[in-house]
Amino acid sequence: MNLSNLQPAEGSTHNQNKRLGRGEGSGKGGTSARGHKGAKSRSGYSKKIGFEGGQMPLQRRVPKFGFTNINRIEYQGVNLDNLQLLVDNGIVTDTVDMAVFITSRLATKTEVVKILGRGELKAKLKVSAHKFTATAKAAIEAAGGEAIEL
């Protein structure tokens, strides 16, 4: 290495953008590349989101549709592999009910629980929940357990 091939470290330097409004001699003084007059030249200007220059904007051209069903029930899903994990960790042995879901943080007190069929269940369990999928119910009964709907 010698003085003819010195270079700054990688990433230590970057090109600075030309500063605006710092005198005519800078090439970007005066109007600061904003042109003359008008709303766009003023400070604080920002184009409104969705504004299309006075044309009817897309969100008003497209019709509304659908509604929110106030009677919809939001289920908290718990899979079979979660139940098997509770058995493997020694948290449950024979019955799984809402108290177990709450203590193991799989659901809260106010949530409605639905047992889903992902994974496999090897243990014989008596499971109490609000709803079961067909595959989950079949898997619980195939393992010798019982599926009780609350």
UniProtKB/Swiss-Prot annotation:
Record-linked Pfam families: Ribosomal_L27A
Subunit organization: Part of the 50S ribosomal subunit.
Name of the protein in question: Large ribosomal subunit protein uL15
Protein's GO biological process: translation
Entry-linked HAMAP family: Ribosomal_uL15
GO cellular component terms, A-Z: cytosolic large ribosomal subunit
Organism: Flavobacterium psychrophilum (strain ATCC 49511 / DSM 21280 / CIP 103535 / JIP02/86)
Keywords attached to this entry: Ribonucleoprotein, Ribosomal protein, RNA-binding, rRNA-binding
A GO molecular-function descriptor: structural constituent of ribosome
Family in the record: Belongs to the universal ribosomal protein uL15 family.
PANTHER family linked to this entry: 50S RIBOSOMAL PROTEIN L15, LARGE RIBOSOMAL SUBUNIT PROTEIN UL15M
